[in-house]
Every structure is written in C-alpha cells, then in structure tokens.
A protein has these predicted regions:
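Histidine/lysine/aspartate-rich catalytic loop segments that bind and position anionic ligands
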Residues: 71-112
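Glycine-rich phosphate-binding active-site loops on the catalytic face of alpha/beta enzymes
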Residues: 37, 41-54, 97-112, 149-172
Length: 184
C-alpha cells in the first residue's frame, strides 16, 4: 500500500527478532523470504544488519543477504553502532558496493563523542556510501548535528510525529519545522 501511495523511495526493515543482531540459519531463511516479499511489492530497498558474537559484521551472512537483495538498494542499519570498531566496519561495508547507505548514531557515548565519530565516518565514507545519521536526532539538535558532522542525510523518528510520540501520526508541520532548521 505504501509503495503505491507515495512517490518517495521506501526501504523495508528486515529484522526477524529484536533481541540481537546475531542471527541463526533459521533467521537467515526468514530474512531471505522477507527480502523476496519486498521485491514483490516493489519497494526501493531493504534495511538490515548482521553481526557475529564478537560484535563484528557477520560477513558470510551479509553476503547471503546481499545476494538475496540483488536489484534492491541496501542500508546497513544501526547494528553498525554495536560494532567494536566503527571505522573497520565502514571499510568492510565499502567493499560491498551493493550497500549504499549506513544508518548510524555514531555508536555509544554523549552527543559530542558521537558527533566526532559521525564526522569521521562522513569524511571517510566520501561518496562511496551514504552515512544516514539517526538515533537521537531531534528537532532540537538536528541543526547542530548537521554542523558538527557535515552530514547530509538524517533519519528522524519520533521528532517527526505528533506529540513526539513514536506511534503518533506523522506531523507535516513538524517536518516543515525540521526542514527549515536544515535550510531545505
């Protein structure tokens, strides 16, 4: 329904469980099945991430998911923030041109620590992969996040909703307010 109703690209989250980003072979099959469903509905792409027990990217699973996602845009989601080494993760992801976006808050820490990391990631990613800054981005900090990180893309969650409610309706007025703060 969404794909037919809007003219913006839609990427669908592929995440079989919320408890972790480490997945079993059964989870992999569920994810591949879901990716096929995304293709059938005509969405622009998928959003997923997969880690191993040592909090590194699970390369074997990633390659299987990328194979299943052929023809779709791929975003590596905030599992990225769980990595023990974000820069190493970025380098690995850049080896896979099928991944064109990383959704990240810059890992753990306060706003200044995360902003510094995000700035480094944006600079190192260059044009190879888009860094989509998300997680804690609000209408109150988005202008400073843009300035501190040199980021160009931001993922807004509850700040775009009525009463700042995660499950509330999207507020066009709030989106205009946020866009104004970004100068767009």
């Amino acid at each position: 329904q969404c794909v037919e109703a809007v003219s913006v690209p839609i990427r669908v989250m592929i995440r079989p469980k919320s408890s972790s980003f480490c997945y079993s072979s059964y989870d992999l099959e569920v994810m591949k099945y879901d990716i096929e469903a995304v293709k059938e509905i005509g969405a622009d792409g998928v959003v997923f991430g997969c880690l191993n027990q040592s909090q590194s990217i699970d390369v074997k699973m990633l390659e299987k998911l990328l194979h299943a996602s052929k023809g779709l845009n791929v975003t590596f989601h905030r599992a990225f923030d769980e990595l023990t080494n974000l820069e190493e993760g970025l380098r690995l992801i850049m080896d896979y041109p099928a991944i064109n976006t990383i959704l990240t808050s810059g890992g753990y820490g306060d706003l200044n620590e995360r902003s510094t990391r995000l700035q480094q990631l944006v600079r190192k990613a260059d044009s190879s992969v888009e860094i989509l800054i998300g997680g804690g981005v609000t209408d109150g900090n988005i202008a400073s996040m843009k300035s501190l990180t040199n980021g160009k893309s931001f993922h807004i969650g509850r700040s775009a909703r009525e009463n700042n409610d995660l499950y509330g309706k999207i507020s066009i007025e709030q989106i205009r307010h946020i866009k104004n703060k970004l100068g767009v």
